[in-house]
Amino acid sequence: MAMFGFPHWQLKSTSTESGVVAPDEQLPFAQTAVMGVQHAVAMFGATVLMPILMGLDPNLSILMSGIGTLLFFFITGGRVPSYLGSSAAFVGVVIAATGFNGQGMNPNISIALGGIIACGLVYTVIGLVVMKIGTRWIERLMPPVVTGAVVMAIGLNLAPIAVKSASASAFDSWMAVMTVLCIGLVAVFTRGMIQRLLILVGLIVACLLYGVMTNVLGLGKAVDFTLVSHAAWFGLPHFSTPAFNGQAMMLIAPVAVILVAENLGHLKAVAGMTGRNMDPYMGRAFVGDGLATILSGSVGGSGVTTYAENIGVMAVTKVYATLVFVAAAVIAMLLGFSPKFGALIHTIPAAVIGGASIVVFGLIAVAGARIWVQNRVDLSQNGNLIMVAVILVLGAGDFALTLGGFTLGGIGTATFGAILLNALLSRRLVDVPPPEVVHQEP
């Protein structure tokens, strides 16, 4: 197979003995479509939730996730099985840059889009460098102790956003708690694909419960489906034009470093599952993700990243065929062109979104700890301990640094602080043995 060409996909059925479908194999059309639906459903929860938290049009974000996934597919030569969805790493910095209050559409989204484009540009440049010299420099710059600390800091930084959106009233607070319980029960007491879709299934159950509590029992503001009934089945989503503000760009662009670390981890996980060496395609994967982020930000969508949810689906199904993600992307694009689907998304109550956010942002924080555990990071070393302690407080407290007219927000200071502190504190002085003492007999 040529390294930079598309593979010759071999037809295979999941009914074969091994049940494993490799990236360069394909299923019959009907099975490919079904698997595509599974992946579209898997990405749905977070890809819808993240733009809502930033005040973006979720319909457009769904559409751009599909287009971005197709772009990623072509740039990687159809060899890397991944789906690109809305990244949670942008939520905190977009809210900080725009002052969004969490309700409705973001009136200042244009300057955030400029920052998202800048982030995608930085990400793309990093990908081009990786294509030339490989990823070892990234792994040295951001070892597991750094990436774990940064990921956990992101989750902690987003915590106030989740709590604020879940506590508009006493009723909303209780419904947020019920949403957390719904998701938790799905996570613990279900199995297989249902368990993998815990956010989506939990959201659906919580919305049904909210509807009973409000529309039937009258305990809160009823869910209004008027917009859904009047919305067209097909139409264009709401596009936005980016504006380039220096401070917003400086605030959002550093997210590229986080996306690199995240994507690197995801691709290593895919390599481990498929038994294929993904290193030759790592740079192109970064470029594909970066260009997809630029394209999404150019029209009003959120920044994107490879999705762990879809990696989880692959782990369950053992189907790694990249053509499945083409099917998932097409399904996402069809949903993105449906205003009725978008109107249905907007009926999700704020309390339910807040409850889901508590779980999602908490899972992000825990993912940082998982990185430490999986890589056996030694937190008994004072260098690691001090770096992690400082970075978690910087991220959780949203510590900002201002230089001239530019401000680096909490996620940015946590990211660069982790890299710099690790480089400084991981240095070891060479132990010089003490001079030998000669004891003379008296």
PLM features per residue range, with description:
Residues 1-34, 219-238, 272-275, 285, ...:
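Intrinsically disordered, low-complexity non-transmembrane regions of multi-pass membrane transporters
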Residues 10-12, 16-17, 44-47, 181-189, ...:
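Juxtamembrane interface elements at the cytosolic ends of transmembrane helices
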Residues 15-30, 52-73, 251-322, 438-441:
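Membrane-embedded helical hairpins/re-entrant loop segments and their flanking transmembrane helices
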Residues 94-101, 187, 310-325, 331-335:
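Interfacial segments of multi-pass membrane proteins
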